[in-house]
Amino acid sequence: MLDQHAALDRVEALRQSALALVRNGDYEDALAVYDDALALATDEDARELITINKADAMIALERSGPEVHELARVIMRRRNVRHVYLAAYALQYKYRLENDLKRALFYGQLALRTAEEANEPSWRRIVLLELGNVYELDSQVATAIRCFEESLAIGEESSANRDRDLSHAYAIENLGYCKLLEGKIVDGLAYIHEALEMLSDPIGRAEAYVDLCYGYLEAHDYDKARFYGEAALELAKEPRQIRNAHYLLGEASYKAGDTAGATFHFDELAKHYPQFRNLKSLLFAIDLRSMVNFKL
């Protein structure tokens, strides 16, 4: 019995180590640690949770695989309400990244209902943040703002969740971006700077830097736009953040009269889209900001 408990403790320690790597943006290393945990785990609940966590990291890397395919089965089995919530949450994130907003909203609403059934305000707070992101992508900015504001209004904390400060900061950051979309540049920048004071994880800080780059570009403050765009590139590991930073830095450099800088960043962006051979020429000819959704 002692050996069994020791094995469970070891598996959980590995899972926590992988989660810490994910929070730091080290997804590849996290996947390897999740594999180590799965190799040791014999308890079905533990294996299911690790599978969900690994799928989450794979989704962040925009990959698929057996673990990602397992998420729907976790929901169908409904063996553990927390696992149902986490699987639904992961699937809404997957479909949000794929711009399948109908499915993203379906799984987001499922995660929200599960949080309400479990009477877990902190779960509800986090999924409201994600639903706000989906509505934001769907150009339903007013609905997105309501989700973010409702998320911010939830102050309770469950013993199973220790990320209230992080989700609170994310909600403020996303609220700021929505204000930018509404043309309320001063308010939007203020919210994002407020969030930046609370964000400690590289992913969140990189997102805030990208949005500040966008906001200052909208405000025609090209020096600040370039400062925050470069800061985003230093931290960004998610492909979306890297693409957006290069695009915005290219625009800011071009507007500032730095053609060489614009060329560099547009060239870097073009590497992500090899199917579009004339992308750089198009970017020099047309300002695409009004046509680009920076959360995709």
Placement of each model-derived feature along the sequence:
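TPR/TPR-like alpha-solenoid signature
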Residues: 8, 15, 52, 89-92, ...
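Structural motif corresponding to the intra-repeat A-B loop/turn of tetratricopeptide repeats
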Residues: 24, 61-62, 98, 118, ...
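Residue register of alpha-helical TPR repeats
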Residues: 12, 49, 86-89, 126, ...
